[in-house]
């Protein structure tokens, strides 16, 4: 069967122009205009999706099949082009019957054209084929437009669903244009409103805990660029204004330390005549420590000196992915659980904004893994937030899982974050030594987010940074009172 793409080539129908018109109409639709005004960051992300839409429409037109009636009419037209005028006159009755049987839009006009001329000439033969071709072009264009209209409705429905999802999550997860683009890419999954409302719920909880949010931001910025002075700095000329006593004596305004011999105090001048104090006088003269009269009159002059150019190189510290281990033991339930999940959501926001990866591992009796920054990040985040913390605490297994992942090439510069109350058994010696080796040799950083003031110091001593967020009732009341 004839494909629509082949028909367009045969009749020289420009499908690119039709596709561009459809995309322009889609972007100009009122729904998108209102959305772009409300969420300007997502406008660029949706616009970046246009090439994908264009390619999908091309593929759809290429694979579409032409109706059998139109296919048969096109075949008849191609055969008629090969006929000479006498042959065409012989075949004309069959051609007209075929057009009538196929209900072709050209059938009635073709019969009227033939009936209006008693003799079929070569010019009439050419005119007949030209008008027939125009009719086929109109039919092919109409078929393209119908197909593109169906695709436009389907695409608009898909975009509206993704806009609803992205619009709900943009205030929570999109901190800049990069994050907005990644959020839009994630919204392509099949999600229902009730699913992503869980993210909205924990986003609202995070806004109610600004201290927890700031803690996540500080952890995310813990690898700032460091400035390093250059050792090979060149000398440069530096001009400065120096204030000096006026050469013309004026009113005495007080005393000062200087090397002005002409205005020495008599006691200072007397030391010059004492042999034992002569060297002391010269030392103080060189160091400008002699007591002299300070005149009221002052003047400024320009002094030219040379000094090293103070330029600095910046050692950009790598900001790698996050590997976050969350304690799901029973002691981490309730408010601790809410804080841990909200903290991971804040790290996900940072990862999206800085184009980093965010990998979550839940540890208790077994380890469950989620990647919140992947193409299915929203679905993974919903699954993670749906988990309940009711297991035991196996901190050693958590560290072993972290170390195993850190040894792979794609995670070599990752930061490990452990969220727990750290009320657990001490770590085995082999785990402790391996962590120290990773810190010393590979410069991996281990962060602890302590949800309790009663964590064991012996466990927490292994971490590079300890971020404390006490979830006890007293600390919660104090934070609320300060706000």
UniProtKB/Swiss-Prot annotation:
SMART domains: VWA
Superkingdom: Bacteria
Location of the protein in the cell: Cytoplasm
Subunit structure as annotated in this protein's UniProt entry: Homodimer. Interacts with RavA.
Gene3D superfamilies linked: von Willebrand factor, type A domain (3.40.50.410)
InterPro entries recorded: Uncharacterised_CoxE, Uncharacterised_ViaA, VWF_A, vWFA_dom_sf
Protein known as: Regulatory protein ViaA
Family: Belongs to the ViaA family.
A cellular component annotation (GO) from this entry: cytosol
Pfam families linked: VWA_CoxE (PF05762)
Tagged with keyword RNA-binding: no
Biological role: Component of the RavA-ViaA chaperone complex, which may act on the membrane to optimize the function of some of the respiratory chains. ViaA stimulates the ATPase activity of RavA.
Predominant localisation class: cytoplasm
Record-linked NCBIfam families: PRK10997.1
SUPFAM superfamilies to which the protein is assigned, alphabetical: vWA-like (SSF53300)
Keyword Flavoprotein: no
Keywords, sorted A to Z: Chaperone, Cytoplasm
């Amino acid at each position: 069967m004839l494909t629509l793409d082949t028909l367009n080539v045969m009749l020289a129908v420009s499908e690119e122009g039709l596709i561009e018109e459809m995309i322009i109409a889609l972007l100009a639709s009122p729904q998108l205009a209102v959305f772009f005004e409300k969420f300007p960051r997502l406008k660029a992300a949706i616009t970046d999706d246009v090439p994908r839409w264009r390619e999908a429409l091309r593929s759809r037109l290429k694979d579409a099949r032409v109706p059998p009636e139109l296919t048969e009419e096109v075949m008849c037209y191609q055969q008629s082009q090969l006929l000479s005028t006498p042959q065409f006159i012989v075949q004309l009755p069959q051609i007209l019957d075929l057009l009538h049987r196929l209900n072709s839009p050209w059938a009635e006009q073709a019969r009227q054209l033939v009936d209006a001329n008693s003799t079929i000439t070569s010019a009439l033969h050419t005119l007949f084929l030209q008008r027939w071709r125009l009719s086929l072009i109109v039919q092919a264009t109409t078929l393209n437009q119908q197909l593109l209209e169906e695709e436009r409705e389907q695409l608009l429905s898909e975009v509206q669903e993704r806009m609803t999802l992205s619009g709900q999550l943009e205030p929570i997860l999109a901190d800049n244009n990069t994050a907005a683009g990644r959020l839009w890419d994630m919204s392509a999954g099949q999600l229902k409103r009730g699913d992503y409302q869980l993210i909205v719920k924990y986003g609202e909880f995070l806004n109610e805990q600004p201290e927890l949010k700031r803690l996540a931001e500080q952890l995310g910025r813990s690898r700032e660029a460091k400035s390093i002075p250059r050792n090979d700095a060149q000398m440069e000329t530096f001009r400065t204004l120096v204030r000096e006593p006026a050469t013309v004596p004026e009113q005495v305004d007080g005393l000062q330390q200087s090397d002005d011999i002409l205005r020495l105090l008599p006691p200072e001048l007397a030391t010059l005549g004492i042999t034992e104090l002569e060297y002391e006088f010269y030392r103080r003269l060189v160091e400008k420590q002699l007591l002299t009269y300070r005149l009221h009159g002052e003047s400024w002059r320009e002094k030219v000196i040379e000094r090293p150019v103070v330029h600095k190189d910046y050692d950009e510290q790598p900001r790698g992915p996050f590997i976050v281990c969350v304690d799901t033991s029973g002691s981490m339930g309730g408010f601790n659980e809410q804080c841990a999940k909200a903290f991971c959501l804040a790290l996900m926001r940072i990862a999206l904004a800085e184009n980093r990866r965010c990998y979550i591992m839940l540890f208790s009796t077994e380890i469950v893994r989620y990647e919140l920054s992947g193409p299915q990040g929203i679905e993974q985040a919903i699954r993670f937030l749906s988990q309940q913390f009711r297991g035991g605490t196996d901190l050693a297994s958590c560290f072993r899982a972290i170390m195993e992942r850190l040894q792979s090439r794609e995670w070599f510069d990752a930061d490990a974050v452990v969220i727990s109350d750290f009320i657990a058994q001490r770590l085995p010696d082999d785990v402790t030594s391996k962590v120290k080796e990773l810190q010393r040799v590979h410069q991996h950083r281990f962060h602890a987010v302590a949800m309790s003031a009663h964590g064991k110091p012996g466990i927490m001593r292994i971490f590079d940074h300890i971020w404390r967020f006490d979830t006890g009732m007293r600390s919660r009341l104090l934070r609320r009172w300060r706000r």
